[in-house]
Amino acid sequence: MKIVDAFIFYNELDLLRYRLTVLNKHVDYFVLVEATLTHAGNPKPLFYEDNKKLFAEFEHKIVHVIVDDFPKTKDAWVRERFQRNCISRGLSQLDVKTEDLIVVSDLDEIPNPKSLDILRKEGLTDICALKQDMYYYDLETLVQDDWLHPKVVSYDFFLNTLKSQIGECRLILPQKIMRKAGWHLGYFGYSAELIQNKLKQFAHQEHSKISKDDIEVRLGGRVDLFDRDMTFTHIPLAENKNLPPRHELLLAMCVSSVSLPAPSCTTPSCESVHEDAGLSSNKSQSPPPPSSPVVA
């Protein structure tokens, strides 16, 4: 059985290195999808393409998909979904079997390698959610709400249920949920300027007008960028029992994201068996989230 880690990419070179490093021994391939336009419709450099030499040790595992054929639209969500569904273009370049597994997540949604190992051992015929701890800004600011958007699907489920619209799996709340299955690192290590840049370019254009000064206030106070009803908890690193693997790389990470335009940078089974990172059943299944995904 093979595992393919598939995600869309914007410009976060250091976070990309972290993801590739911690998952390299646990997946067979990476499908990295980057585009010539932002979700807001603005031209952007191909940051991975321009910096491939920084990732030479992983290149033999990476299928790089460049999206330059967006449909003509003013809708940022149409562009977002189109780019994510282009994961299928990467899968078509691999010898993927029906029993193989596809991880579908954003770059900052880091799967737990132990969870992937369990799935590889036990298999999956349809879909499961990776229940992740959600951090904002740093590794000491934990959001009380769990994050359920990252999914793992079998290639058979992708072909016959999703009908190749792989991005739609993020909107499904499946019966199977794998606990302690990763870490969502929202705006991790970002300065106010970098956050403002991302907000101007991503699909949630309703948040694109937030000022840099307002962002700095929210960063300093460790409060939500979008005034949502979210509870932030400070948890010292020494007291955290579920830190990401090799978290020292995250602490030392200098985010390489830059304002656009810019030159190239130089620099799993039943709950009782797997208590820490196993599959459990979502007994009270809720309806899927609305068509616009939750802001990350």
Predicted regions: what they are:
Residues 22-29, 33-37:
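Short, acidic, metal-binding catalytic loop of nucleotide-sugar glycosyltransferases
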Residues 114-201:
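Conserved catalytic core of nucleotide-sugar-dependent glycosyltransferases
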Residues 172-270, 276, 296:
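C-terminal catalytic/acceptor-binding lobe
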